[in-house]
Amino acid sequence: HFPGKGKKLGIVPWCETIGVKFGANLNAYTSVDQTVYHIGSAPIKREGIIDSCLLVLNDWSQFINLEAKEIDKERGVIHEEWRNRRTGMAMQRMMENVMPKIYKGTKYEDCLPIGNMDIVDHFPYKDLRDYYQKWYRPDLQAIVVVGDFNVEQMELKIQKLFGKIKAHKNPAE
């Protein structure tokens, strides 16, 4: 779910000081085969803002807070999202009926991205931490930057910041 409160940085409060609002410009979503963390409409007039946004991405890539208290808070957030989608969006209810047909015979056939609320309520913390370590690794992530900037400079910034991250010794492929 959303890692907006990364372990190293106070991400959400800082982003809001530059006009990047939580929910509208700073958010995340999970589909059947990817999780996307998004920072949008960040003002790039100041070089420092670009650097700070890259630091936010770096924080998300390896310093997610998986302490029990934070996990339990997110369980509540997931429940609220599930409830809102079920009561307010016919599209969500339709997808719950259509997805098993669309994905018949695949590993996605019986699982919606938001999950089963019984599992959300009862999974052991260790299971989530193990899953995170297995699949939410920097070597399985991509960074997409869109805007009016010098591409070569941006590539150098990304390589300098993210190139320091060590690869996992036993990746789960």
PLM features: residue spans?
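An aromatic/glycine/proline-enriched structural segment found at the starts
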Residues: 142-173
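Short cationic amphipathic helices and targeting signals
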Residues: 36-39, 137, 141-147
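Acidic/histidine-enriched alpha-helical segments
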Residues: 13, 64-83, 150, 169-173
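M16/insulysin-pitrilysin zinc metalloprotease superfamily fold
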Residues: 39-74
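Solvent-exposed loop/turn segments at secondary-structure junctions
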Residues: 43-46, 85, 149-151
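M16/MPP (pitrilysin/insulinase) zinc-metallopeptidase core fold and M16-derived inactive scaffolds
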Residues: 1-40, 110-114
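Scaffold signal of the M16-like zinc-metallopeptidase fold and its non-catalytic homologs
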Residues: 2-3, 28-33, 49-56, 60, ...
